[in-house]
Amino acid sequence: MSVPNEPDSSLAMHSWNLTPQQAIEVQKQLAVQTVRTGNPEGVQRVAGVDVSFNPREPKALVHAVVVVLSYPGLEVVDRQAVSAAVDFPYIPGLLSFREAPPILAAIGQLSQKPDLVIVDGHGYAHPRRLGIASHLGLFLDLPTIGCAKSILVGRADGDLAEAAGSLTDLLWRGEVVGRAVRTRSRVQPVYVSPGHRLGLDSAVEWVLRCCRGYRLPEPTRQAHNYSNLVRKARQPISLNGLSGAK
């Protein structure tokens, strides 16, 4: 999708210029708007989103990338990156207020719109049920999945078998908020939760469909690799005027 002259209303749900306490209140308000049912149909393009940064960088640069893959072929058809200095502090549970503006700016530069987005991060498995995958899903009005490398809240409900495709629920405060998913035999699992416009079962199915023998599903694996390249090479830009960065 090309960058519009004026931001789409779906990309202007709230200001990003917030204090941490204000950000928490926004999360509480938005969490009730997420839809955790359904299964995307007619998917032809799946995007992976990842962010990298170097904590030793004095300007706190965030390097956000989106990589779009064909489906079911899983070949890269588009990718974009935005590197920008951000002011919001690094606070677990509030990372979307640091990372979403450059992510949305990168997505706004795509020539091919994805039908489904897999985010390196959490969705419903979040202290206020609004991880970055859920937050992005609401802004983009697209089905989104959180696929994280570590647990933010909760614990696995029992042992997870070593075989690829093994699953166990992720429980927090008596509720199933996600699943631990073994995507490769005898390798650490990923932690999957719905972001927006699909259910947990569908989120897990899509992650497994997008795997190619690595721990990470191919969309976020490609995004992870690209974000590291960008981190080593890119210079910061201003987010002003870029789609989705308001």
From Swiss-Prot:
Compartments it resides in: Cytoplasm
EC number per UniProt: 3.1.21.7
CDD domains the record matches: Endonuclease_V
Record Pfam families: Endonuclease_5 (PF04493)
Example GO BP: DNA repair
GO annotations of cellular component type: cytoplasm
TM region positions: none
Annotated keywords: Cytoplasm, DNA damage, DNA repair, Endonuclease, Hydrolase, Magnesium, Metal-binding, Nuclease
Catalytic activity: Endonucleolytic cleavage at apurinic or apyrimidinic sites to products with a 5'-phosphate
Predominant localisation class: cytoplasm
Family matches, as PANTHER family: ENDONUCLEASE V
Family, per entry: Belongs to the endonuclease V family.
Protein name: Endonuclease V
Organism: Gloeobacter violaceus (strain ATCC 29082 / PCC 7421)
